[in-house]
C-alpha cells in the first residue's frame, strides 16, 4: 500500500513544513508550495502550480471562487492563496503524481504528526470506511455552530493577508444547505456504533486532518462535490464537509478512539500537534 501525507502552503501562510515522525509503513510527505526555499524537514517539496497546469474540470469560470474566469470576469478571479490551496485539499485527484497512492492523508500546514503508526492505521480505516477524520470538539455536532462561528477575517476581509478575495458568505451557504435538506438531527439517528469520536461531537469534523481511500470511485465523487462547495459558496470547508457527508452517505470513521486519544484535538491529541498559523 502506498500512502502520501500532503499539504499545501501558498503565500507564506506557514513558515516551513513541520517535522514528522517516520511511519511504520512506507509513506511520502509532499508539500505543495510556491516557495522553493522552504526548509523541507524531510518533506518532498513540489512547486508545480497544478491548480493552473491541471485545472479542475469543475471550475467553469462562473463561480464566486473560480480561479479561471475569462473575459470581463477575469479581474474577479479568486487567486487568493487561501483559495488556491483548496484545490490541493479538495481536488487533489487531478494531480498526476498522486494517482498511484492508495491512501491520501490531507494535513493543514499547521499540523505536525507525532506518532509512527498513523499511516498504518489510516490504511486500515480507509479500507473499511473510506474516510477518517477527527471530531470537532467545539461544535457539539451542530453545523449551525460551525457556520455561525465563522465570522472571521479570513472569510470576510476583502484584503485578507493583503490579497483581494470576494466576501465569503457562509451564513448564506448554511441557509442554502437547510433549503436543500441538510438535517441537523441526522447524526443522532445514524446507526453506526463505532467510529463516532466522542458521541456528543459527532457530525462536525476537523478537516485539518482527513484521510481518504484514493482508489475509491465514491471518494472521487465525494471530493468533487466537496470542492464544488468551495467554488460555489465559500472557502470554509468545515461547513461544506458535513453537507457532502450527508449527500453522499460516506460517513468518516471519527476519532478519537481507543488507539488514538484526544477528546480536544484542537488542544491535544496523541496523533498530532496543531500549531498556531504563522502569518507573515
Descriptions of predicted regions:
Residues 158-280:
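Catalytic core and acceptor-binding pocket of nucleotide-sugar-dependent glycosyltransferases
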Residues 5, 29, 93, 110, ...:
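A residue-level signal for conserved active-site and pocket-lining positions in enzyme catalytic cores
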Residues 1-85, 96-101, 230-236, 247-250, ...:
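N-terminal anchoring/stem segment of glycosyltransferases
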Residues 88-154:
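GT-A fold catalytic core of metal-dependent nucleotide-sugar glycosyltransferases
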Residues 6, 31, 104-108, 130-135, ...:
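A structural signal for short, well-ordered beta-strand segments and their strand-loop junctions
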Residues 45-54, 59, 65-86, 91, ...:
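Core catalytic alpha/beta fold that binds nucleotide/phospho-ligands
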Residues 1, 25, 89, 107, ...:
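Residues that flank catalytic or metal-binding motifs in active/ligand-binding sites
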Residues 10-13, 35-37, 50-52, 76-77, ...:
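Short, solvent-exposed loop/turn segments at secondary-structure junctions
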Amino acid at each position: 500500500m502506498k500512502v502520501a501525507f500532503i499539504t499545501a502552503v501558498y503565500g507564506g501562510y506557514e513558515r516551513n513544513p513541520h517535522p514528522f515522525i517516520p511511519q511504520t509503513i512506507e509513506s511520502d510527505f509532499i508539500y505543495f508550495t510556491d516557495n522553493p526555499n522552504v526548509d523541507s524537514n524531510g518533506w518532498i517539496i513540489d512547486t508545480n502550480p497544478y491548480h493552473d497546469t491541471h485545472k479542475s474540470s469543475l471550475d467553469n469560470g462562473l463561480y464566486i471562487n473560480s480561479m479561471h474566469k475569462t473575459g470581463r470576469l477575469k479581474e474577479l478571479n479568486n487567486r487568493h492563496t487561501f483559495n488556491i490551496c483548496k484545490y490541493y485539499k479538495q481536488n487533489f485527484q487531478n494531480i498526476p503524481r498522486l494517482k498511484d497512492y492508495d491512501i491520501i492523508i490531507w494535513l493543514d500546514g499547521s499540523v505536525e504528526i507525532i506518532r509512527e503508526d498513523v499511516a498504518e492505521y489510516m490504511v486500515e480505516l480507509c479500507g473499511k470506511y473510506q474516510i477518517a477524520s477527527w471530531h470537532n470538539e467545539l461544535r457539539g455536532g451542530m453545523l449551525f455552530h460551525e457556520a455561525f462561528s465563522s465570522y472571521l477575517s479570513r472569510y470576510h476581509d476583502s484584503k485578507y493577508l493583503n490579497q483581494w478575495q470576494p466576501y465569503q458568505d457562509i451564513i448564506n451557504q448554511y441557509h442554502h444547505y437547510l433549503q436543500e435538506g441538510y438535517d441537523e438531527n441526522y447524526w443522532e439517528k445514524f446507526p453506526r456504533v463505532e467510529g463516532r469520536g466522542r458521541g456528543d461531537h459527532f457530525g462536525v469534523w476537523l478537516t485539518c486532518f482527513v484521510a481518504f481511500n484514493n482508489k475509491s470511485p465514491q471518494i472521487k465523487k465525494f471530493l468533487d462535490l466537496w470542492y464544488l462547495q468551495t467554488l460555489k459558496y465559500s472557502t470554509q470547508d468545515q461547513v461544506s464537509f458535513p453537507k457532502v457527508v450527508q449527500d453522499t452517505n460516506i460517513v468518516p470513521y471519527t476519532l478519537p478512539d481507543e488507539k488514538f486519544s484526544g477528546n480536544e484535538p484542537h488542544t491535544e491529541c496523541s496523533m498530532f500537534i496543531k500549531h498556531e498559523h504563522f502569518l507573515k
